[in-house]
Amino acid sequence: MSKTYHFIGIKGSGMSALALMLHQMGHKVQGSDVEKYYFTQRGLEQAGITILPFDEKNLDGDMEIIAGNAFRPDNNVEIAYADQNGISYKRYHEFLGSFMRDFVSMGVAGAHGKTSTTGMLSHVLSHITDTSFLIGDGTGRGSANAKYFVFESDEYERHFMPYHPEYSIITNIDFDHPDYFTSLEDVFNAFNDYAKQITKGLFVYGEDAELRKITSDAPIYYYGFEAEGNDFVASDLIRSTTGSTFTVHFRGQNLGQFHIPTFGRHNIMNATAVIGLLYTAGFDLNLVREHLKTFSGVKRRFTEKIVNDTVIIDDFAHHPTEIIATLDAARQKYPSKEIVAVFQPHTFTRTIALLDDFAHALNQADAVYLAQIYGSAREVDHGDVKVEDLANKINKKHQVITVENVSPLLDHDNAVYVFMGAGDIQTYEYSFERLLSNLTSNVQ
């Protein structure tokens, strides 16, 4: 039976994906959010989903209301009105936990790589059989007839605890979100609690020391590059400017050669996890092989464009591990070009906690440009760290730039520009694109 859903904070990446999925399943969907443009809203607009400003008049007791996790009575009029008037609502993760019970569910968790891996698994499985999915880049697809449900499983504030999927991948465990987690051990404990809720199969990266300590009542399958100790092993790697080719073995059995048109060693591991899960779940590997070849990636993960013959890459990387992976992918695809990193640190707490690691990661580029730190709505800038503190630790050519003046980026010939961050780094990218376009106009 069709329902009416109202999303408080519909432009959030998970919220927009869920809204799209429910819309495609035949439900009436609307939502509210701030007026500022966010990259997820284009998909909502194309689907004809109404986006309203926050207003208590948006709420109706007959609706099923889903609220974004960032909103509280003290910062959102709709939440405040709902609480004052006894109107019930569910948080995103609470709704998702109950929603997935009607499907064979497959989750993807991990400190890094979960969006790309969720996208890859969704792409392959939806081409094999009817599948609904939610990806953290704001993409969602729903089918009333789907048996399978693929979703991204987020560890922040332990939001994944309402989830009990049949299968799950955990890509890695790393210290992140220092505004919530107190230590690597705290992060591990969250993932270990999640792992205990998997019912049929858990697939973890076997070369991650923390993941080796994971326990679960479900069978655990390890994947990696090393033959010893891993169940699914990727070997015979061929990394070229058109993608990556590799062979996968399962406990000594050759499962064949696979190709992905994406870049970086991390994507080979993501694909190995997907292959392992689908093989274990009983899917035809020939179909898996065929559809991996057409996976082009997800939004804001190594997204490329060319402006005035200049290659620009946009990536959500906001943790040192992710920066290293993104720069590795750029070098694979563009081995003869200078790799220029343009990075905006995201949150003061993360920048303080990982300052030396950020410097080490950014030193993998040939030149580094830094934008001012993007503070989260959850924190206050106490002046404990500035972007110049990071700049002082970088030993490659580096400079702090402003969105009003990105012209220093023009000092490079034969370069690829990699814009990275989870804040508003795209405003710097767009400023650079306008500068490049104006150069073309002036020449003409």
UniProtKB/Swiss-Prot annotation:
Reactions catalysed according to its record: UDP-N-acetyl-alpha-D-muramate + L-alanine + ATP = UDP-N-acetyl-alpha-D-muramoyl-L-alanine + ADP + phosphate + H(+)
GO cellular component terms attached to this protein's record:
cytoplasm
GO biological process assignments: cell division; cell wall organization; peptidoglycan biosynthetic process; regulation of cell shape
Q: Where in the cell is it found?
A: Cytoplasm
Source domain of life is Bacteria
**One of the Pfam families matching this protein, by short name:** Mur_ligase
GO molecular function, a single term = UDP-N-acetylmuramate-L-alanine ligase activity
Specify which residues bind ATP according to the UniProt entry for this protein.
Answer: G110, A111, H112, G113, K114, T115, S116
The reply on keyword Cytoplasm is yes
> Predominant location of this chain?
cytoplasm
User: E.C. number, please?
Assistant: 6.3.2.8
- Is Ubl conjugation one of the keywords UniProt gives this record? no
Pathway assigned in UniProt: Cell wall biogenesis; peptidoglycan biosynthesis
InterPro entries linked: Mur-like_cat_sf (IPR036565), Mur_ligase_C (IPR004101), Mur_ligase_C_dom_sf (IPR036615), Mur_ligase_cen (IPR013221), Mur_ligase_N (IPR000713), MurCDEF_pg_biosynth (IPR050061), UDP-N-AcMur_Ala_ligase_MurC (IPR005758)
**EC class (word):** ligase
Keyword terms, alphabetized:
ATP-binding, Cell cycle, Cell division, Cell shape, Cell wall biogenesis/degradation, Cytoplasm, Ligase, Nucleotide-binding, Peptidoglycan synthesis
Listed PANTHER family:
UDP-N-ACETYLMURAMATE--L-ALANINE LIGASE, UDP-N-ACETYLMURAMATE--L-ALANINE LIGASE-RELATED
Q: What role does it play?
A: Cell wall formation.
Q: Which family does it belong to?
A: Belongs to the MurCDEF family.
**NCBIfam families xrefs:** murC (TIGR01082)
Name this polypeptide is given: UDP-N-acetylmuramate--L-alanine ligase
Q: Which gene encodes it?
A: murC
